[in-house]
């Protein structure tokens, strides 16, 4: 593929890949191999962009296996080698990002990322319970991220520049969906990731913009499943909990800690049908019922400068909000 940005930079990507899979008794084996090449050329623009010409190319691939322990249970193992070339913005940005009120600087010396990933999974499904556990370990060489600089180029905009370092990411996801009775669902999920920049002092030990540990529980009851006019009618209540995130990239005050918060969300919905065909759907949602003031750790709006009289920096996420959605199916 070829693209051009603002007539100052050009990009050409090309790749080729092959995949295969094989089934043998309880085993399912799969694998893939890919080669990518990216060429970028930046044209000089006086006072803004310097001339740049970079070429990146590398192989990536993966092998995986799934073993069925029983008809309801299986385990999974995958090993992958990854490659990602820096993009145009990471190499040559030089200007204000209006969405985050930041002045972004690229880094023409960035190297491509190379990674190893290992993930192990377990799945179980039965009429009463469905459960899944996934664990992963990533090692990424030359991981690219942006960090805050001390200087200010444009008033009112903090300055960030892309840099890179060697990283290790460990984490996992777990989910349990219980069906104690036919129409009742109790869904639970938890996710966690620990991302560390290797061989760095405490202030820059953790990678920036790492999601906080996240847990959700939803209780859903299907009122009508197969009615003559109403179908898939349900009500639900969900609890969303984001734990405190204190693993931050503190160098240059790039990040700040984010406290924990819990939200309660309610929902209801139904389909309308005639002659056995779905004609329309109606959904009602009420999120953040208790109007909790909170900031998501990944929100870039958390760091915006607001009214000086407000002791809390940044823009908060949405408070209590009620929505109605009506969908008409034409075909």
Where are these regions (language model features)?
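Extracellular loop and loop/strand-boundary signature of outer-membrane beta-barrel proteins
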Residues: 2-8, 43-52, 102-108, 117, ...
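Short loop/turn motifs that connect adjacent beta-strands in outer-membrane beta-barrel proteins
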Residues: 25-26, 72, 128-130, 182-183, ...
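Structural signature of Gram-negative outer-membrane beta-barrels, strongest in the C-terminal barrel
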Residues: 2-140
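C-terminal beta-signal and adjacent terminal beta-strands/loops
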Residues: 83, 139-141, 186, 241-248, ...
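Residues on the lipid-exposed face of transmembrane beta-strands in outer-membrane beta-barrel proteins
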Residues: 16-22, 63-67, 120-124, 172-178, ...
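Transmembrane beta-strands of outer-membrane beta-barrel proteins
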Residues: 29-33, 61, 75-77, 131-133, ...
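Outer membrane beta-barrel strand-and-loop segments of large Gram-negative receptors
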Residues: 11, 105-111, 117, 126-187, ...
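Gram-negative outer-membrane beta-barrel transporters
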Residues: 136-139, 157-245
């Amino acid at each position: 593929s070829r693209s051009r940005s603002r007539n100052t930079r050009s990009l050409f990507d090309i790749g080729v890949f092959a995949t295969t899979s094989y089934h043998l008794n309880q085993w399912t084996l799969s694998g893939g191999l890919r080669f990518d090449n990216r060429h970028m050329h930046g044209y000089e623009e006086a006072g803004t962009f310097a001339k740049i010409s970079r070429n990146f190319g590398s192989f990536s691939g993966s092998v995986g296996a799934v073993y069925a322990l029983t008809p309801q249970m299986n385990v999974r193992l995958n090993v992958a080698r990854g490659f990602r070339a820096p993009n145009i913005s990471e190499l040559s940005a030089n200007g204000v990002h209006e969405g985050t009120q930041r002045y972004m600087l690229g880094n023409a010396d960035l190297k491509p990322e190379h990674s190893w990933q290992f993930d192990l999974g377990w799945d179980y499904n039965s009429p009463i319970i469905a459960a899944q556990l996934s664990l992963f370990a990533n090692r990424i060489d030359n991981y690219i991220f942006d960090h805050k600089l001390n200087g200010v180029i444009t008033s009112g905009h903090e300055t960030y520049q892309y840099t890179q370092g060697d990283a290790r990411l460990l984490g996992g996801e777990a989910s349990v969906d219980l069906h104690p009775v036919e129409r009742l669902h109790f869904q639970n999920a938890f996710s966690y990731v620990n991302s560390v920049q290797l061989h760095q002092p405490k202030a820059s030990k953790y990678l920036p913009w790492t999601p906080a540990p996240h847990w959700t529980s939803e209780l859903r009851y299907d009122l009508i499943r197969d009615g003559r006019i109403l179908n898939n009618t349900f009500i639900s209540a969900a609890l969303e909990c984001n734990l405190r995130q204190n693993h931050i990239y503190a160098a240059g005050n790039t990040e700040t800690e984010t406290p924990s918060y819990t939200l309660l969300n309610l929902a209801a919905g139904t389909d309308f049908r005639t002659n056995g065909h779905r004609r329309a759907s109606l959904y009602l949602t009420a999120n953040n019922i208790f109007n909790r003031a909170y900031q998501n750790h990944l929100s870039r709006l958390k760091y915006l400068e607001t009214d000086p009289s407000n002791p809390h920096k940044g823009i908060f996420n949405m408070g209590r909000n009620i929505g109605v959605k009506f969908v008409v199916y034409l075909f």
